[in-house]
Structure formats: C-alpha cells, structure tokens
C-alpha cells in the first residue's frame, strides 16, 4: 500500500523542491461513490510575495487568497474562466507560496469514471491541463480550504520519474522577469503534459 503524505513531508522543503518532489505522487479524491486518482506529471511553483505572477505578490491578501496564508497542505481552489484550478499551499503559516497541479496521468481504474466526468473525452484529453484534471477528479470550488491531511483529498507516494524537466510557466505573460522563471516541472515524455507533442512522448517515463 502506498504511503500517505503527512504534514512532516512539507517541513524543511522549499516550494520549488516540493513542486519537483510531488511529481509521480498519486493524487486521490475519495468521492461519495468512487475513489478517483492519478499520478502528478506537471506542476508549477508560485513564490508568493516576491513573485509577480503569484496571486499573493507583495503579500496581497483578499478573500480569495486568504487560504494561501494557511500552513502547508491547505488546498487553494480558484476559478479561471470556466475552469477550476487546484493548488497546494507549501510553506508555514503566513508565507503565501503554492504549487499548481497542471496535469496528471489517470490511474487505470479511474479512467471510465473520468471519461464520464469529462463528457466523453478520452486519452490524454482527460487530464492534460489544470482545469481538465479537476473536472476528471470531480474537484470543485467547494474544495477550497480543505487540507491534504484530514479530508477526502490526499497524496500518496507512488512513482519516481526517470527525468524531470524545468521550463517557463505557462500563461504568465507580461510579468517581467517572472515570465521567464523556470518554475514549471514536468515528467519528461509523459503524454499527459499540457501541450505535449507526439514526437516528445516517451514509452518509459517512470523508474
């Protein structure tokens, strides 16, 4: 059985380290009827007060971002256009940094249920984007404020990537130097990475 991630996992790690280290972990959502899960293959780090691309830049605090000031493991859901995005708070209370989950590889047993939630989408289209994966997992804005440690959403140790790549974050234009921060982390070769080209897909991506 995979080990469930507890509070101590986040201690003494930076947000960048966590964004890399959770690649390959199994993200689980226990719904009322079924357990849905997938393996994280793409993340982005957001570095709080000094990161102009972060919602908490300059320690901005609003009703929406209030959760970012909670301890590591808090779940920050927010809506962008018609999509809901999933983030985990990464640092101690009062330090508003987070990791955005951008893509997952569906657990095989979850695929039939995810296809229903994604209105018939199949293959990589199921979960190859931050709004797609939340829909596939059945996550909604109502999950805002939960934590990874005492709710129906959690992480488990699962797989180890062969290679992790770091590139610029997606959708961060006109943010000065922050536009070019290499804070997007991916499991090299995963077919589920957002915007992945067929020629970049590898058959062996896990150790």
From Swiss-Prot:
InterPro entries named in the record: Formyl_transferase-like_C_sf, MPG, MPG_sf
GO biological process, one term: base-excision repair
MF terms (GO), sorted A to Z: alkylbase DNA N-glycosylase activity; DNA binding
UniProt KW keywords: DNA damage, DNA repair, Hydrolase
Enzyme class: hydrolase
EC number of this enzyme: 3.2.2.-
DNA repair keyword on record: yes
Keyword set includes Translocase: no
Family (UniProt): Belongs to the DNA glycosylase MPG family.
PANTHER family per the UniProt record, alphabetical: DNA-3-METHYLADENINE GLYCOSYLASE (PTHR10429:SF0)
Protein name: Putative 3-methyladenine DNA glycosylase
């Amino acid at each position: 059985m995979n080990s469930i991630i507890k509070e101590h996992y986040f201690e003494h790690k930076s947000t960048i380290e966590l964004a890399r280290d959770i690649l390959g972990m199994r993200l689980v959502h226990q719904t009322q009827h079924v357990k849905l899960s997938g393996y994280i293959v793409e993340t982005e780090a957001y570095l709080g007060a000094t990161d102009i691309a972060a919602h908490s830049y300059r320690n901005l605090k609003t009703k929406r971002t209030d959760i970012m000031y909670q301890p590591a493991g808090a779940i920050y859901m927010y809506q962008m256009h018609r999509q809901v995005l999933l983030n985990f708070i990464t640092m101690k209370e009062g330090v508003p940094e987070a990791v955005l989950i951008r893509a997952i590889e569906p657990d095989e047993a979850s695929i039939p249920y995810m296809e229903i939630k994604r209105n018939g989408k199949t293959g990589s289209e199921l979960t190859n984007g931050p709004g797609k994966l939340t829909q596939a997992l059945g996550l909604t804005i109502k999950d805002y404020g939960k934590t990874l440690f005492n709710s129906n959403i959690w992480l488990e140790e699962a797989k180890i990537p062969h290679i992790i790549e770091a590139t610029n974050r997606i959708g961060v234009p006109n943010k000065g130097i922050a536009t070019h921060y290499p804070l997007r982390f991916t499991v090299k070769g995963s077919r589920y990475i957002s915007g992945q080209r067929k020629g970049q897909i590898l058959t062996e991506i896990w150790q």
